[in-house]
């Protein structure tokens, strides 16, 4: 999943064809610092064929929230979720996946409604390093400080690959209407009503972070979705606004 890296091509193409999908491949953390899983026990690594591809957040003992583009067209037989680990490739516990559900309105091209729920094949046992996170009921306000975590690239070019240990970065929320305005580079067509943005100088999520949590006041406020490059000026990271899709999450978690 290299969405963040294909965004440049897509943006250039879209300038001529009026169609964007700026997506962030696997999201990543740039400009952050190491984080202990004990401080983010809801953080998980989504694995395909025994390799990290995306992040996710624990909603309940058998439900994980992630981005739709992280699981689309993937067989559950190839998927596992690593929980309770500081490292995406070791520690904690690997749980097989029983099923997943992508939002019915998910749009592969524009990445609208980029959210999915994963049902684990076996239930989690909660501990100091494995816990669920509650859902935000209201969207974070503009300028609010939020934390974003994951094992994604530390550099835009991916020279160092995925981070070996969990990373976290503090960003500031940019309200959806402002993010879609002429102040930034995306435009109204590409920042949907169910999206929210966040940024800070030289800080961002990057490839490998997609599907991971944006946390505000200890609640899940967003899901890392897409962006143009990593840490690019005038191109904030774009996230699914959890408060907007909260009803869908609750309903789907009870039926998947």
Give the ranges of each region predicted by the language model.
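N-terminal signal peptide
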Residues: 10-27
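Conserved catalytic-core segment of clan PA serine endopeptidases
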Residues: 30-31, 80-126, 131, 138, ...
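A conserved glycine-rich beta-strand in the N-terminal activation segment of trypsin-fold
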Residues: 41-61, 110-111
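Chymotrypsin/trypsin-fold serine protease catalytic domain
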Residues: 87, 115, 121, 127-200, ...
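Conserved H-D interstitial segment of serine endopeptidase catalytic domains
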Residues: 22-27, 46-47, 64-67, 72-108, ...
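C-terminal subregion of chymotrypsin/trypsin-like serine protease catalytic domains
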Residues: 2-8, 59-69, 80, 162, ...
């Amino acid at each position: 999943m290299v969405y963040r890296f294909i965004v440049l091509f897509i943006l250039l193409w879209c300038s001529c064809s009026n169609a964007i999908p700026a997506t962030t491949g696997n999201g990543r953390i740039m400009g952050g610092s190491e984080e202990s899983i004990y401080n983010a026990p809801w953080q998980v690594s989504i694995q395909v064929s025994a390799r990290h591809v995306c992040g996710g957040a624990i909603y309940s003992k058998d439900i994980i929230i992630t981005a739709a583009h992280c699981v689309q067209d993937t067989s559950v037989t190839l998927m596992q979720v690593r929980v309770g680990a500081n490292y995406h490739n070791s520690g904690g516990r690997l749980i097989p996946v029983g099923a997943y559900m992508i939002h019915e309105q998910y749009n592969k091209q524009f990445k609208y409604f980029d959210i999915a729920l994963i049902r684990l094949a076996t239930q989690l046992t909660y501990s100091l390093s494995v816990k669920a996170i509650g859902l935000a009921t209201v969207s974070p306000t503009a300028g609010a400080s939020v934390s974003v975590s994951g094992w994604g690239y530390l550099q835009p070019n991916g020279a160092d690959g995925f981070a070996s240990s969990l990373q976290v970065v503090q960003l500031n929320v940019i309200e959806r209407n402002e993010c879609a305005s002429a102040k930034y580079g995306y435009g109204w067509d590409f920042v949907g009503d169910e999206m929210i943005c966040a940024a800070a100088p030289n800080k961002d999520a990057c490839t490998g972070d997609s599907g991971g949590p944006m946390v505000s006041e200890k609640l899940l406020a967003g899901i890392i979705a897409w962006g143009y490059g990593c840490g690019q000026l005038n191109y904030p990271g774009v996230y699914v606004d959890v408060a907007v899709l909260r009803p869908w999450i609750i309903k789907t978690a009870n039926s998947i």
